[in-house]
Amino acid sequence: MAQAPVADIFAGKYSVGQQVTVKGWVRTRRDSKAGLSFVALHDGSCFDPIQVIALNTLNNYADIQRLTTSCSIIATGVLKESQGQGQSLEIEADEIEIVGWVENPDTYPMAPKRHSLEYLREHAHLRPRTNVIGAVTRVRNCLSQAIHRFFHENGYCWVSTPILTASDTEGAGEMFRVSTLDMMNVPTTEQGQVDFSQDFFGKETFLTVSGQLNGETYATAMSKIYTFGPTFRAENSNTSRHLAEFWMIEPEVAFADLSDIAQLSEDLLKYVFKAVLAERADDMAFFAQRINKDAITRLEKVIEQDFVRMDYTDAIEILQNCGKKFEFPVSWGVDLSSEHERYLAEEHVGAPIIMQNYPKDIKAFYMRINDDNKTVAAMDVLAPGIGEIIGGSQREERLDVFDRRLAEMGLDQEDYSWYRDLRRYGTVPHSGFGLGFERLVAYVTGMQNVRDVIAFPRTPGNANY
């Protein structure tokens, strides 16, 4: 008999009295003096397990009484309305096949108790079996599907940009080098530098920090594209907001200015928040109960509110005059820290903010210079409860201005010759943004650390599994 997902059973896709087969892992087992056992089976398809009733008339009932957490079983039986509290349906088993035992349950790392998130990170290969990481995984999947659906419905083309690259999109130099050279016998040039001409690609190559530059090449032909893939930053940052490997969503739109891309960011966030509240109500209820009591209400507020547009210069004035003492002093020309962003979004406005027009000296080389020659057409979306969640800009499409910007930042034109071609052959105003997927998942779930919303976190000193 085909497997019946537990989620489908609870969704009413199977009728009471129908015989079903469920496959999964034991969460708990409770034995009754009346000669039966109650087995909570979980298959990952939804938050709740389904109760399987095993009568002592089953041939292998003695083995069933030995079941412990995470033993794998296949149970076939009749679906019934539950007489007990806490569940609406249960299965009275005609047969229970024990597929896999847990070796030495006393030392099993995921024993049925509440573990700290730090402990779970140390057992990342087993933590999907817990309520919290299982719920995170389903919400992450829901958000991913909703993002693809949003762009598909709005006429965007999904482009897979390269992971291996010779370009530094951010111009910050915090990149992972990729090489097949023998580290014990590195070839050198006459000047004593590493001779990358003998490397696999014949030049110095890195893991990508962003798909943006490659995405722009397709936006200037396909009009509207987006990328959704892994990116890498060699930042030695041990914080709750940073990962060395993470996923980014990066739309690029031709004939779009900063206002257009700001509206796109608002539309995207509202769309995916609506989707997760509708499709993962069980998991979101868990997060509201156990992780952050505002997990649901703050998403609802974002959906209902208009995002507030604010200029960076105005924000600095607000911060300087608010009377609040910040850890990091505020002045025009400094990058806003998380405490500044959260004050503005949570206390001053009480709604998401789209911060615009930042000083050019704190932003990347590809952002369009404004007429004041001091600021760039850049924007960040600041969300209450987390701060920056999206960063984007109108791209500099004027070749002469772009070349001056490269020179100002000490970047070599030759390294960006193909990128300059976009400005030489049919240049067009275009804009885009980057949305860090893990930060989005953390915001939605209320999880405080991005290491807990990605399967196997990569951080300084940690590349396990």
From Swiss-Prot:
It is found in: Cytoplasm. It holds the Pfam family tRNA-synt_2. Belongs to the class-II aminoacyl-tRNA synthetase family. Homodimer. One of its GO terms (molecular function) is nucleic acid binding. The keyword Translocase does not apply. InterPro entries: Aa-tRNA-synt_II (IPR004364), aa-tRNA-synth_II (IPR006195), aa-tRNA-synth_II/BPL/LPL (IPR045864), Asn-tRNA-ligase (IPR004522), Asp/Asn-tRNA-synth_IIb (IPR002312), NA-bd_OB-fold (IPR012340), NA-bd_OB_tRNA (IPR004365). The keyword ATP-binding applies. It catalyses: tRNA(Asn) + L-asparagine + ATP = L-asparaginyl-tRNA(Asn) + AMP + diphosphate + H(+). It is an enzyme of class 6 (ligase). Its EC number is 6.1.1.22. This is Asparagine--tRNA ligase. One of its GO terms (biological process) is asparaginyl-tRNA aminoacylation.
